[in-house]
Amino acid sequence: MSENEFDIAKSLFQDEADSDIDTRPRKRKAPTSLNLDVMADDNGDGDDGGSDDDAAFIAAHQASMNRKASNLKGRTVKKGGGFQAMGLNANLLKAITRKGFSVPTPIQRKTIPLVLDDQDVVGMARTGSGKTAAFVIPMIEKLKSHSTKVGSRGLILSPSRELALQTLKVVKELGRGTDLKCVLLVGGDSLEEQFGYMAGNPDIIIATPGRFLHLKVEMNLDLSSIKYVVFDEADRLFEMGFAAQLTEILHGLPQSRQTLLFSATLPKSLVEFARAGLQEPTLVRLDTESKISPDLQSVFFTVKSAEKEGALLHILHDVIKVPTGETEAGKHAREQAISGKSSKKRKRSEQNNPNPQESPTEHSTIIFVATKHHVDYIASLLRESGFAVSYAYGSLDQTARKIQVSNFRTGISNILVVTDVAARGIDIPILENVINYDFPSQAKIFVHRVGRTARAGRKGWSYSLVRDADAPYLLDLQLFLGRRLVMGRGQQESANFAEDVVVGGMARESIARSCEWVSKLLDEDIDIQNQREVAMKGEKLYIRTRNSASAESAKRAKDVVASDGWTMLHPLFNNEASQMEVEREKMLARIGGYKPQETIFEISGRRGGKAGDDEAIDMMRKIRSTMENKRAKKQDANQPTTDAEVPASALATTLGDDKDNGLGDDMDQDDVADMSMASDSELEVTFSYQSDKSKSKKKSGDKQSSGTFQNPEYFMSYTPAAHSFAEERGYGVHSGSNSNFVEASRDATMDLSRDEANRGFAEPRSIMRWDKRHKKYVSRRNDEDGSKGALLVKGESGAKIAASFRSGRFDAWKKSKRLGRMPRVGETENPGLGSTVPARGQKFRHNKEQAPKAADKYRGDYEKRRKKEQELQKRQAETGMLQFGSKGGTKKVKSEIRSVDDVRKARKLKEKRREKNARPSKKGKAR
């Protein structure tokens, strides 16, 4: 039957069709919407209306079947586009169902078919959208089972240990039912154990770049068998911190590999990832409009530097209302530790699979700070406040990091203080709140931070503390997100925390109480005071080394900070009591902004009544008039002349309110800048650059404002119409001075050989720095590759790597294990080496063999025990083992019969001893 034909036999013979398909008795309503009147035509014997009747019947039947399928209750209806339609094997589909995935997410639906088709893919989607499963599912489908040939086939590189652990967890869950071997190679773990893992011929390697490069150099690994490479959080991996490691790793990978790049923040241009070796990649960018979850409520508080600790305590106590003291999960764990009734097996199972009731509570909060010194300081401060706190940062010991994160996941602690090491990849269940104690310097870091909450359809809140110095970064974030900037309580009716960037101050009285408590604590506790001083020094270094904001945002920030809405009470505090706080803030602002009409010289001269002071009074009046004239001219120069030159700060605060303000009548809707999709030309029009440009525009008159030389009918811009410059700048890979490919390409010059040996004209000198330890100037190149003055050696790719990577520990490990030549790639694996890496689903069992107990004639099982003794004696006689001792222990007797190799070895040793003694034989003496 063709696709255009329709079978009506089931409708004509409904009972028979039902009996053939399903014999189970079930109640079913008759399709009431099926119109059978079309068959009861008066002219039914004619042929004129036959085709129309059939068409109407078929249409009615199809409509009824569609309604029937949608109205089925308690019965599942398979929809198109699921995992079943992707051609996955049965074991993998069972693992996906067991994991809880029913319908693939958009990134999985777009990516998995491309990966199974052996295409290179660059994928970007929001945090929490299932990117990890998008590359793990096709990897397991392609690798299928363990290969007996030596050589790993899959490699997943992650920028942090926590993200690698999260990926390992997903691989274990989705790889259940297969015998694939997977290893985790991260820093902080024992190198000797990882030597054993790699010797066991794993199929999948999940690693961080530093430790994997160390093992590659130390073990001289051959990566020619790698077929599947994944760069997770690719924009972070390709930054300057991992440049040397990736160069060496990529050099060893084969050209025929399949390369995948995934991250939540990726630019459109793939030039920055050219070193990854992509071959005709497919770019999949989803959710570019909604870069953060629509269920996330974002709040931005303006604070002063001295009030940050008090503002943090105010948020925790009064806004989030985090309870102090020990948590319920902590009490339960302490009671179990005291009682000791639970067995070791039960404790181990609870650690591996925490109870859902012991997961983080609704008060669970992550606090992001700038440096590890801030982590120590804030954790100690909150612990003194009575909160249950965990902490983690990059240089913390791996075991300690696991314990701290596990305490937060299981609910033993309510607060987790971390650096940006936890901004990518840590999947904390039921996380409600994120606090940015130090505002991020890049918009994409903010996206990764707040992406820890509001996942899987749950609501979440993010609170950010913004100082005056952080205002340019806030405006960069506003441009990146393409949202409206709402300041203070002036527009509290229209403020939307999920769709706007709402900025405002905090309640002065509450902050004052918290700041007073912090000051008292610092005076009493010398340890916390020392931690604060160290954190302040680390903050100075962090501010000097962080990426700078855009010039336009820095210019706009001056007007934004000077506005009244910057310090106005935040719309979040919308209650009756806050109205008094608003009036109090206004009064304090009036008092603080009071300026007397006359100077002290004029007031004292008038009071004195002396004639000699008239000259000083006249001089001060002239100076004041001159200053006022200059100030008025400066204000006139800064004012925009046209509607298109309105500052972006004022424009952003009024977006969406044009109809209310009357702008909709005078201004076309297309003239309003859409910050989410702003092109280069729109950015040039939106932002006024300098005052002299506005003066030149005044002179040009209406000629420039009326139109340009561009004919909109024929003009073709060099950038796409939907190109957002601010968005691409936020997604770009930031790596020190070379933060942009365009800027780096400008510095590139043609390298021509000179005919003179001296330095060429305008050639930059090699930048040096003073090394305090060695008391000499050293090159700054070592700072960029992370070696910091350490000894370097050249790798296989020519890149300089740390000399400590070739320490000889692998040779010592082989010697201790008495291993000879390791099998090479392509050879059959050695089964004896595979015991270090268990296959998926394999259980460890005790295989210790003990001698049977002596048979007792007076017991009922005498014959059974006697038979076991005879079998043991027979086995000992076959293997050359002799029984000794009264407990039935065994010992293998050394055979004194020498083999051919033993005889040859003994002869060589004898010859060496003879040459060493250098004594002539007795025959020689006789001659």
Curated annotation (Swiss-Prot):
Q: Know the name of this protein?
A: ATP-dependent RNA helicase DBP10
Record gene name: DBP10
InterPro entries the UniProt entry points to? DBP10_C, DDX54/DBP10_DEAD-box_helicase, DEAD/DEAH_box_helicase_dom, DEAD_box_RNA_helicase, Helicase_ATP-bd, Helicase_C-like, P-loop_NTPase, RNA-helicase_DEAD-box_CS
> Where is this protein localized, as stated in its record?
Nucleus, Nucleolus
Region named Disordered: 1-54, 326-363, 627-671, 683-711, 819-927
A single GO CC term for this protein reads: nucleolus
Give the principal location in a single coarse category: nucleus
Q: Where is this motif: Q motif?
A: 81-109
